[in-house]
Amino acid sequence: MRTVPGSGQERPSYLHRTLSLLAVLALFQGMADAIRAHALTDHRVLVLLLALYTSLVVLAVLVLTVRRQRALVRVDLAVLLAGFLRFAAMFIATVGSHQQTYRDDEGPLVTLAARALVTGGHVYGRHWPHFAQQFGVSTTPLMNGRFADSFSYPPLSALLAAPFVNTLPSWVPLLGLFAFAGLSATALFMFRALPVQLRPAATLICFGMSWYLFYVRNGYPVFLALPFLAVAVHRWTRTGAGGVLGRQGVVSALCLGVGASAHQLGWFLAPFLLAGILLARRGELPWRRALLVTGRWAAIALGAFLLVNLPFMIRDGTAWLGGIGNVLTQHATPQGLGPIDISYYLTSGTGDLGMYSYAAALLLVASLVALLLYPRRLAPALALLPWPAFLLAPRSPETYFVLLAPLWLLAFASCPQEDYQRLWQWRPRLLADRRFRLALPALLGLPALLCLVAAVASPVPLRMDISTVRTATAADGGSSAVTALTVKLTNTSDAVLVPHFASSNNAWASFDWKVASGPSMLAPGGSGTYRLIRRTSPSTTAGATGRTYLRVLTDNPQTLTSAVIPPGRMSTTG
């Protein structure tokens, strides 16, 4: 008896079985360690993890043995449920009255903003200078020696948290629960929206990647945006097809507006999505109709964004505008996984950190222009194109890339592949020249490259001479750590500099230093001797290199000067 394609009675393909098996294997990550960790501490979590571990073995067998496509889809759904329960068990294991509520600053700042909203106070333009001590979390240090202590996200997270923030026990990570709900909704939507053979990727990406747990647990607002952005990019090549938005187009626009009200990363996706929709519609419609339907879509998205933000625009005025853009304008200290590491690790610093920001902005513009010029080649990567530019920024952690990974696959795989070849492609005479066509991508990236070279090559503005160094054994009984030192700085630049000090023996810098003596600023050509004392007892840090660096940062202009604290000058004290 012949089977009808698409009926679910046909045999699964090797690709489908392979992806399903990879999804199961990904869920084994960390299971054994988690089971051992809770063997004597939390029997409820232990029983759940043991049951899941056993079920994963059974599901792996079923993946390779079921005979029909429909049966494998049901197994995939069971694997998705197992992934959800595994993630939930590991999440629950980190929650309790004896546990720290959050371990990073995003959740506490959103919590404080929600409390301010409930009491009728201002949300934007308000500072909470003691929130780090209140919640026991680390902070985001700034180039001016301070730290980020205000709510610097669009308001959706605070709006959602406000009804619950004063009713739940203080140890419940409310923002973590919202983030988990957002990730789960994204996984379920991906499973429903992806082609049948790719549905295991929903489990693999959302629940099988170990990096998500930390960020979800600590309530990163980007997970509130994720399900809305997923709906926005779903079948984007068909948005406004025939010049009519329809229900799918309206929902897509609304979700983009709401997603942009949850996190700023949605702002960077929006112009690429707008350009892609315009090119898709121009491929089938005259310019006027293509612009009209795309304009209606953009207007609905903007209207949804403004509607969510309207109460804060009225209440906080200009502070609202500065607040939602503060993450982009604040001068956070350098840290990341891109070219900034050249100045941070490989050289003694840079005299112009701002050039990294210019390089990132120019590459972002170049990526958008490249999409407009080569849509049929680049449109499959539309949801990925905004993020390479972030590699060039002074602060380029992995959160800008991997947390939005579900969008990369969904935007590509949910669109009919033939749609990419129907996109309108501008072909001016210059692009008819093969040599110019080959050289154009390099020309688009040249301004960003020049800024990057300028940032790396800019000489450091300070000359350092480290003299007296005092160390002490770390509080946890580890190796010795620097507790005080004396350093002479000479300003070799033509700008007035206000130095701020940090030290590091791994990827993270410690700003736990007090200037006991020394001038507050250095004039061009001026010198000053600074005596630095660590405020708290040092502790052994994971990933320590054995060498300790002194980092001197200035904010205006943004500069970084680094030097190794010579180990030969250290004298250990008790």
Spans of features found by a protein language model:
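Short, intrinsically disordered terminal tails adjacent to the first/last structured region
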Residues: M1-P12, R422, W426, L440-L450, ...
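Primarily membrane-embedded glycan-assembly and transfer machineries that use lipid-linked glycans
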Residues: R2-V233, T237-A241, A280-A389, A393-P397, ...
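Hydrophobic/aromatic-rich transmembrane helices and adjacent perimembrane loops
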Residues: R44-T54, L224, F268, P397-L431
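Internal/C-terminal transmembrane anchor helices
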Residues: A78-I92, R429-P459
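Membrane-interface alpha helices of multi-pass inner-membrane proteins
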Residues: F207-L213, L229-A230, R247-A275, L307, ...
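Membrane-proximal bilayer-interacting regions
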Residues: L346, T350-Y356, L373, Q417-G445
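Short aromatic-acidic-glycine turn motif
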Residues: N505-V515
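Short acidic/polar inter-strand loop motif in beta-rich domains
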Residues: L553-S562
